[in-house]
Amino acid sequence: MNQEPKKTQEPNIIFVSLEQTELPKFREDGRKQWVSYGQDNDFPERLLELSRRSALHGAILSSKANDAVGDGVSRKDRTADEVAFLNAPNPEYDIDELILRCAWDLALFGGFILNPVMSNDGSRVAELWHADWSRFRSGVKDEDGR
């Protein structure tokens, strides 16, 4: 039995240089009433762009948002008024769509904003809207830290 010596293979290594996104520096500017979200105040827009440019990133965000919503809000064992509100918390979409929009913002930005509209007498929430996180900025703290 004459065996040939085994040839050693060189490792096949490929280096991939991935684009790195520099995290924004949040700055208070005494001339403005809000905290800038990065140097050009555009970090939320950059996050949106990245989610659109990368199919994988967008799919991960969609999956996280859809997993958070699950089968939606159950209408079982609810009063007629509760079901009416769940079916239309505002004139444009139902509660499941509202939660999906919030879950998407939570996955992408780390937070979400709800905008409740009170009834004329102020006794109940008449409408509930999702507000686009990318359009909001934090206000500058006052002397009391609020």
Positions of PLM-derived features:
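Flexible, gly/proline-biased loop segments at the beginnings
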Residues: 1-144
